[in-house]
């Protein structure tokens, strides 16, 4: 199942869960937690809805969860990836909003990608990014907390006569084909509805907001998704859940209050840590 693969790769956990205590906008796809979840889960959902969390349910049928949500959006079965790809297109190329500090500091978005689709590397095998101040490709130094501020998130550059783009630029360019109009022909969800959900996703994410918990300040990104068997049990679930995590990544809603967390069943750490 795609969820378990991404749970391990992104969260070090077997499953992924929304932080219902602080989440203000929840997208539920392929799951019916209000009747198929456990007692504790139902209690958390009830409390979240009672305090004002907005819940949008994308499901082919009007489930009990859809009936309790703020909006039910019927979708053609197995087309959730098209819906989320269109949301990404709207956010990146129509609205033009994202959490730049998170993307620069926590993801490979500034890494340079060559014509062959692989990250560019120097003679020592280190991944390269573009330094905006020196205007040249430099090795990524994860030990330097100041470096991300200097790196280009978007752009096309030349390194040793090789044309390259940042990883985030390639994502932004790639999703241009996934317009809401295209997604409407696939999912049967109106293009305007997709745009409205994408706009809400950005607005509720509160990019730049923080929250203090137990004397420590954390980023606050109160938007999340909840996926279920209706997503993971169909063809291409890996790509669907990749699109889901990209949605969270764009706004920095990963492992922060209000956002997308690893579940209570922990794995053995990040998979790269297991490689000798």
Model-derived regions, located:
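Short, well-ordered beta-strand core segments
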Residues: 26, 55, 72-74
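Short, polar loop motifs at secondary-structure junctions
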Residues: 58-64
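A short helix->loop->beta-strand "cap" motif at the edges of active sites that frequently abuts
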Residues: 47-54
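Long, well-ordered, tryptophan-enriched scaffold segments
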Residues: 66-67, 71-217
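Short, basic, glycine/proline-bearing loop/turn elements
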Residues: 2, 26-33
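A glycine-rich, hydrophobic/aromatic-adjacent loop/helix-cap motif
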Residues: 175, 181, 197-276
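Glycine/threonine-rich flexible loop motifs
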Residues: 32-43
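Anionic-ligand anchoring segments at beta-strand to alpha-helix junctions in alpha/beta enzyme folds, i.e.
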Residues: 1-22, 261
